[in-house]
């Protein structure tokens, strides 16, 4: 648990280690080791470790998950698709959190939020299966009111709002519209009693506005940290992101946006 969790400015950083595994798999080597990266990220201030075990195992593989689980000191947040195989793995491994995400083999990265409205029965059943195994469930969804309501109705206690459209906005006006959608989504989630996280596409120059939203409990960030680490080192990259997030939250609470 980080020091920042004891302050009014509490906001957690979940460091996603997927692209450490991507770098490893590019040459089929045993390095860089994503488990080592996870443990170093915790030492540098990460509040959780996020990893996505995709069906095609394009980056994280089963051995990474199994090796990391008993060694993680903060929380493991395992992202996975709503499939029997992945749910069985999650129930066996029992991460602290399981974030259910949509998945397509053709995509480079997750392209949007889980359609809870359209797949309500399957998602609700998955939530129950995971909860019965003692795993806290999060649903990765777009900041859409109908999706947020449906997420609440599944019994999931946590949502993670997809920030990809905000991150990929082509101009300031579009980015502002997407930011307002996220802010509205945060308020809607909190009103329903949900813990609200956010993530996807956030980096060192666009995270400030999102981190400043007082209702967001956690941001999950990976690619930007891995990329920045090439130039400043892994520990520094994690520390810098956490510092930026906390500074943005503190400034917002004190009227200094």
Curated annotation (Swiss-Prot):
The record marks 160 as: Transition state stabilizer. GO terms for cellular component: cytosol. It catalyses: 3-amino-2-oxopropyl phosphate + 1-deoxy-D-xylulose 5-phosphate = pyridoxine 5'-phosphate + phosphate + 2 H2O + H(+). Transmembrane segments: none annotated. Pathway: Cofactor biosynthesis; pyridoxine 5'-phosphate biosynthesis; pyridoxine 5'-phosphate from D-erythrose 4-phosphate: step 5/5. It is found in: Cytoplasm. It holds the Pfam family PdxJ. Signal peptide: none annotated. GO terms for molecular function: pyridoxine 5'-phosphate synthase activity. 3-amino-2-oxopropyl phosphate binds at residues 16, 27, 201, 222-223. Its EC number is 2.6.99.2. GO terms for biological process: pyridoxine biosynthetic process. The keyword Mitochondrion does not apply. Belongs to the PNP synthase family. Catalyzes the complicated ring closure reaction between the two acyclic compounds 1-deoxy-D-xylulose-5-phosphate (DXP) and 3-amino-2-oxopropyl phosphate (1-amino-acetone-3-phosphate or AAP) to form pyridoxine 5'-phosphate (PNP) and inorganic phosphate. Homooctamer; tetramer of dimers. PANTHER family: PYRIDOXINE 5'-PHOSPHATE SYNTHASE. This is Pyridoxine 5'-phosphate synthase. It comes from Burkholderia pseudomallei (strain 1710b).
């Amino acid at each position: 648990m980080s020091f920042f969790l004891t302050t009014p400015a509490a906001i957690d950083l979940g460091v996603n280690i997927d692209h450490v595994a991507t770098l490893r798999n590019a040459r089929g080597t045993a390095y860089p080791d994503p488990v080592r990266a996870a443990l170093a990220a915790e030492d540098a201030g990460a509040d959780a470790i996020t990893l996505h075990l995709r069906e095609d195992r394009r980056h994280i593989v089963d051995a990474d998950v199994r090796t990391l689980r008993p060694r993680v000191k903060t929380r493991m947040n395992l992202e996975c698709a709503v499939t029997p195989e992945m749910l069985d793995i999650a129930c066996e491994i029992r991460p602290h959190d399981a974030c259910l995400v949509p998945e397509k083999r053709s995509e480079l990265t997750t392209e949007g939020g889980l359609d809870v409205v359209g797949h309500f029965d399957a998602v609700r059943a998955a939530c129950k299966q995971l909860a019965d195994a003692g795993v806290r469930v999060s649903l990765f969804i777009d900041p859409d009111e109908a999706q947020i309501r449906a997420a609440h109705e599944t019994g999931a206690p946590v949502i993670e709002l997809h920030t990809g459209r905000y991150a990929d906005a082509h101009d300031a006006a579009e980015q502002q519209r997407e930011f307002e959608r996220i802010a509205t989504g945060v308020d809607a989630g909190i009103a329903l009693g949900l813990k609200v996280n956010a993530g996807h596409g956030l980096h060192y120059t666009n995270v400030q506005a999102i981190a400043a939203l007082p209702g967001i409990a956690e941001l999950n960030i990976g690619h930007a940290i891995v990329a920045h680490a090439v130039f400043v080192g892994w520990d520094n990259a994690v520390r810098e992101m956490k510092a930026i997030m906390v500074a943005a939250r503190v400034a917002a609470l004190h009227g200094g946006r």
